[in-house]
């Protein structure tokens, strides 16, 4: 069982100096918008009485075959299971789409037609939140990994633009260290609530981060700035399985 590790990797370039130049830079930064590249949907499910993960595994194995025949190549399908629970009664269906609502709807129809409602009760409200991959990790071919999802909200006066340059700095650090880690940012329509999604591709990720990144001089500054400028409601750790 893994211990939930809150990875405070958001950084805000905030200066204590109140010069006009700093104010102008802050204003310009606040106008920067994310270059969103995909849509993210999460569907939470609860297992019906008498069903187990074996039933879910068998069901989705058939779905993968049927989905492939549909040639809907613009979707990625993941199953997320709570990592800390010994007895799993719930799971989450994660769908990444290339801004294609119809493809997501088609996949949901496939799930329903194949009988997912006999196995689990799922909420299939499509929200199509905007997402962007801030750090890619393409060296892993492992379809099983750990994913931590933090639900956060910007503090008043701050948004994605105010920490864009800092995200780039952090990204450069992680990539130079070759840490097996990926980072995604999913924003709500109000631009204030967001998901900070950490993906870890090795079991001893805490040790790796502790010995390679957290020891860097500016890691404490990054943690302090994260706490000062954004508030996270909670963090959930999942075992993630990529199906498509």
Residue locations for each model-derived region?
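Classical Sec-dependent N-terminal signal peptides that target proteins to the secretory pathway
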Residues: 1-21
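Short S/T/G/P-rich N-terminal loop/turn motif that feeds into the first structured element of a domain
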Residues: 17-219, 228-244
């Amino acid at each position: 069982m893994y211990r939930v590790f809150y990875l405070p990797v958001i950084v805000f370039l905030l200066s204590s100096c109140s010069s006009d130049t700093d104010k102008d830079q802050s204003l310009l930064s606040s106008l920067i918008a994310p270059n969103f590249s995909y849509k993210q949907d999460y569907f939470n499910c609860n297992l019906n009485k008498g069903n187990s993960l074996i039933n879910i595994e068998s069901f989705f194995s058939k779905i993968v075959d049927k989905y492939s025949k549909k040639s809907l190549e613009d979707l990625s399908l993941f199953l997320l299971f709570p990592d800390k629970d010994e007895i799993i009664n719930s799971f989450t269906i994660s769908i990444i789409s290339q801004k294609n609502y119809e493809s997501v709807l088609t996949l949901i129809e496939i799930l329903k037609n194949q009988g997912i409602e006999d196995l689990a009760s799922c909420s299939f409200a499509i929200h199509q939140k905007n997402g962007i991959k801030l750090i890619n990790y393409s060296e892993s071919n492992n379809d099983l990994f750990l994913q931590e999802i933090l639900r956060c909200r910007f503090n008043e006066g701050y948004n994605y633009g105010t920490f864009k340059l800092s995200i780039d700095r952090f990204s450069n650090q992680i990539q130079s260290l070759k840490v097996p880690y990926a980072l995604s940012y999913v924003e709500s329509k109000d631009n204030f609530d967001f998901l900070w999604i950490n993906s870890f591709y090795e079991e001893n990720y805490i040790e790796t981060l502790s010995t390679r990144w957290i020891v860097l001089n500016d890691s404490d500054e990054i943690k302090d700035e994260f706490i000062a400028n954004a508030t996270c409601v909670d963090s959930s750790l999942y075992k993630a399985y990529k199906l498509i």
